[in-house]
Amino acid sequence: MEFSENSLFSSVQENGTVTNDLWESLRSCQKPVLLYGMGNGADKIIATCERKGIDICDCFASDGFVRGQLFHGRRVLSFSEAKDKYRDSGFVALLSFGSFLPDVMDKIRQVGKECELYAPDVPVFGNTLFDMTFCRQNFDRLQSAYELMTDDISKHLFADMIRFKLTGNLRFLTVTDQTRQTIYRDLLRAEHFSSYLDLGAYNGDTVRELLTAAPSLQTAYAWEPDRRSFAKLQAYAESETRCRVIPLQRGAWSKPDTLTFDDSGNRNASILENASADIKGRIRRTTAIAVEPPDHFLRDRDVDFIKYDVEGAEHEALIGTRQTIADKAPALWVSAYHRSEDLFDLPLLLHELQPAYRLYLRRTPYIPAWDLHLIAIR
């Protein structure tokens, strides 16, 4: 399968065609393959490489970050040590962590100038890999979702995201990056918002962020299921004077239920059903959380804007808001990068729930292809 100018990729045909995926290329690669970084991302990449028959020779970290650590039984090398050890053969590096911090992204790009570097796209949640087989199987749905995009920026970004997911090439990540404030100001016109539902509010950071762009905001309902993050959210709500912040410890889902939740206390804590198989085996603490459809909460409340950043549960949360979306069509900001299916599944679902929505795809700076946002406006 070749993605050419006659397909949905016509808006970025200058970037060339994609005829195979990163995993196929790595299988036939003659250079040693090394991991760049440690943690959950590395575990997922190792598991994928094992399934694909790709050998990982070593693991390295940026110079200054190595202190004798072991990872999967190997001593972690510094980048300088890796370059010295593989001086004759060279090597392929697979980025296995992510960051939005400018200095960290600069370090990543510098490594990419000194060796052959790719950022494999492994799902944040779920077990489905966005490889060439997946792309072929879902091409019609990808095409349909692409056609729902309202502007050229969205279409260009949509195409580049597929190219990145298949190749891991960082050059596809920077063309259309925007700041969150630009999205609030120029796309959402947030200055008109008076009420807001934040699904996945973490410690209140997105309420704080929105208030900069929405001076008329009066009420923010902030849902956060994780107990540690919720404690921070409560403290923020008590201190915020610009609007009324109402914190609620609950999760968003398609129906009322009690689900098992990763009780790790980090920003990516999630419903355990959403975790990938390799991550589930390493979760040590879980708890039961109450989840409910946002529609139940919104029966007697109006909101202008809803944000969905619910760690892989976006589809279920949108289903749980279907009545509000159908009847009132508030502006939506939906995270579209947690699952491999999200790129086409979420636009198609939103169009089904509310055909009047105009759909936009935007991305804020991040390596790899995280912080991909689907914006819906009537």
Predicted regions and their residues:
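Phosphate/nucleotide-binding beta-alpha loop and adjacent structural elements of enzyme active sites
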Residues: M1-I56, S62-R378
